[in-house]
Amino acid sequence: VNNNDKEQTAVQYCEKHYPAMMDEYKKLMWEQYETFCKKQRNYGPTNISVGTSLETPDDIKLSLTGLWFRINDKVQRLKQLVVLGQPGEVGESVQDTFQDLSVYALIAQIVQNGKWGKK
């Protein structure tokens, strides 16, 4: 890393040195955001809040536990597809599974930060 690179932000550095990778990252993040918004429009926030207001530590723990189960389901799915090389019968691709994992991880952070379902 030269001195000019050290003066750049991490974003500037990555966009300069890895433009194709950064463009792909932003494209995937946008696709995930659009999918997230469509699902929110269809289901609303109660599927994650599990019928609670997410105001107590127990409410948040319940929601995060539910998300843990969903994430674990996806990890098990990846194990079948990638590690064991067994195609599934439900037609969920590796790409779809990675996308779901990414979105669930972000949802968990939103819940933990106290912003889930807030206007």
List each model region and its residues.
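Intrinsically disordered, low-complexity regulatory regions
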Residues: 1-119
